[in-house]
Amino acid sequence: MTTSFEELTDSYKCIFFDAFGVLKSSAGLYPGVLDRLRSLRERGKEIFLVTNDASKSPHRMVEAYSHPEAGPMFPLERIISSGLLASDYLKNKVRSGWVAYMGKDAASFYIADVGLHPVPIGQLNLDEHSPKALVLLDDEGFDWFDDLNRAVNLIRQHNIPVVVANSDIT
């Protein structure tokens, strides 16, 4: 017996969609995604986008998951990213100072947004910065050999938390 998407979703008030690979690929939205999302909303379902993409701010995420004619598929408050979870950890546990990070410059949003001072691992100078944490935000935007070596040495020599916001790195 096959269960339809509608029958399956009837059992739930809230539905979480993984972002990349579920709603779209590098080629764009999968066929039928907009109709499915619209149908769920019409049926009173709360829908959220969940992603481990910490390479861009939530506002950029809204843009990335927008359709040229239909507009944003998810409003800002319905996007849950690993970057937001990293920000929350930093806000509650680190609270002040420098935070070294690995990833694109745009990913540093998640550090700066909570009042901390981001420094790319490749620019970290321990004479000038005393990082309170290391955050892995993206698998791009750094030199894999030199910067990964710097990160390993940093956590080997300093007892600081390591926050892994994008598991694609590990």
Regions found by a protein language model. Name each.
Residues 1-170:
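HAD-like aspartate-dependent phosphatase fold
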